[in-house]
């Protein structure tokens, strides 16, 4: 029972942390967001240059960040549902997690409408939704892999 409660608490805290990260990024003004993206882009380009790769464009980095943060959300949502509703079949958990992720993407873009120097883009909602789906699939596949390696997982 204690292990189940700990897993539920941890999964909920993970979801809340990912949401806080996503929404706090969206609340940044356009100038602050650009400065942060430029700093990350400089670091990524240094690493790529050291590995013999070419530079990454700002728009590509921003889109990759959108996808990655929503992939983390998708993984955390499906994990939370597996912990909180273990009796609910995955075929029912999946649409619930995905819908929650898509609503989060719409909310995220809505926040940006009210952030100075930012705008909302429908294409970002689509990209974020794809990230949610990818994160969910990765989490489910990872769990299946763990079960094959260790039947108690």
Residue ranges with predicted function:
Residues 148-153:
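Short, charged juxtamembrane terminal tails flanking transmembrane helices
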Residues 105-129:
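Interfacial helix-loop-helix junctions of multi-pass membrane proteins
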Residues 2-77:
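"…centered on the first transmembrane helix and the immediately adjacent amphipathic helix/loop
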Residues 69-84, 132-146:
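Membrane-interfacial alpha-helical segments at the cytosolic side of multi-pass membrane proteins
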């Amino acid at each position: 029972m204690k292990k189940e409660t700990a897993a539920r608490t941890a999964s909920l805290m993970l979801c809340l942390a990912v949401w806080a990260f996503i929404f706090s990024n969206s609340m940044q003004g356009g100038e602050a967001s650009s400065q942060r993206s430029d700093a990350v882009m400089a670091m990524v380009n240094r690493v790529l240059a050291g590995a013999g790769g070419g530079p990454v464009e700002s728009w590509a980095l921003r889109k990759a960040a959108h996808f990655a943060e929503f992939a983390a959300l998708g993984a955390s949502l499906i994990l939370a549902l597996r912990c909180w509703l273990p009796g609910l079949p995955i075929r029912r958990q999946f649409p619930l997690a995905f819908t929650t992720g898509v609503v989060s993407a719409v909310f995220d873009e809505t926040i940006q409408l009210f952030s100075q120097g930012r705008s909302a883009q429908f294409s970002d909602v689509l990209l974020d939704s794809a990230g949610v789906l990818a994160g969910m699939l990765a989490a489910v596949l990872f769990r299946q892999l763990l079960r094959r390696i260790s039947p108690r997982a």
